[in-house]
Amino acid sequence: MSEIITVKRLFSDAKIPVRHSEGAAAYDLYAYEDTVVAPNERKVIATGVRITVPLSCQGTIYSRSGLALKYCIEIFGVNIGPGETKDIVVDIYNHGKMPFNVAKGDRIAQIVFIKLFGGDLHEVSELSDTKRGSCGWGSTGIS
């Protein structure tokens, strides 16, 4: 049985988050207002929805890759903690040279719900070696 995340429209014409492809990890978030984000401007945009996240997960808001790539738009990650109810807003910054126009109903960000680790952390004096070791950031190459 899957978790239930409850969503309330704050306005009858607000759009609830939707996954646009089968198996997608993220739900798209829609702007509830028309606005313009000027170059080098940061703005908070309402979505018109409120979400309650179950105790077993957290919701995190991310950029949509296409907007980031095409328009130099960055979304600052807003977190909705376990058991928290929050009006969903998108904290957006325009790194581009042109104004970024947002129309009501545009998909401006995405939210991912992440299952939480419920275990305990234990401090140790040494860590076991792993196959990957301390490698990361590009250590596996591109081919």
Swiss-Prot record:
GO biological process, one term: dUTP catabolic process
UniProt-recorded Gene Ontology molecular function terms: dUTP diphosphatase activity; magnesium ion binding
EC number per UniProt: 3.6.1.23
Classification via InterPro entries: dUTPase, dUTPase-like, dUTPase-like_sf, dUTPase_trimeric
Lineage top rank: taxon: Eukaryota
NCBIfam families given in the database record: dut
Family to which the UniProt record says this protein belongs: Belongs to the dUTPase family.
Protein name listed in UniProt: Deoxyuridine 5'-triphosphate nucleotidohydrolase
Species for this entry: Antonospora locustae (Microsporidian parasite)
Gene behind this protein: DUT1
